[in-house]
């Protein structure tokens, strides 16, 4: 029988460099001491301060610093399911706090707000007891003293979605959405932000790193490739005809998709399917359309079937997964989209709720009304909360450890 502990160190080093997920690397290094010594921890590129964006009308921000948070969205399952309920995974976002060794903060998976986790949630997770799959990695700009700029509100420090491209171990590029929908690029070797002044007809709504390139889409559906070397924009897809109010770019199986959501305001519900958010006498419903990018034709082509996929639309990232990987087949199959119902431009809504759209039925519902989907997010499953010691006054911070 092969003694895996005796594999050549250079081969182990080569394998470890192919592991993009930090959690895969943790499990790799936990196999034995020789594997641990052969594969060092991943180097983080953002353990330093970044300047704030150029701002002529807000000079008080010139002394504000930014940092980049690394966040991972995980699907966690028990290694040995004991019952049918254990076949459901738990989807959670973790913020890897690089300033405190091996300490992480648990967040809501489609936003960056903390969840109020139960007191008996464990403070320490032994990752060797679970199957951990990283569904998505995202970066988020933040200000360490977000609420501590004298005389100014947190709203003035609102930071948009950010995506990253790594060039090598020492160089990286960030693309972010600024206030009023403009784009800005940060190149690590420049140590400064460059605002892109190329023509954008309407404000940018979403960003994505796809096929090694930065893509951005505006309110009308016009999609461009952002060149971080020349700071020029190249048309990738023409605007949609009669598009909706909110657009998300998402990669799935090597292709780029567009999810276009239309918000419908009515005095009385006019749709037989879906759910409605009420504000006084006004109701809000949602219409979804899905498109696939055909770049050679510079257009978005509407699709009628997503296959057996789940789309997740978050504040700081979008990602997809096979439905069969997320929920047991005994519960159901099909295509689903998880999204937050609140949108800044939709002033009639005063709270954020997680919704799910069923592609095949065309119906939308609140996740908390569907137990088979709600258990993916909240509360934490019993096999998490009962396998460790209770912790009082738990704030959402935890540590990870692996056995070696």
Curated annotation (Swiss-Prot):
Highest taxon in the source lineage: Eukaryota
One Pfam family, short name: Beta-prop_KIB1-4
The F-box domain, residue ranges: 2-50
PANTHER family in the cross-refs: F-BOX PROTEIN SKIP23
Protein name: F-box protein At2g17036
Native species: Arabidopsis thaliana
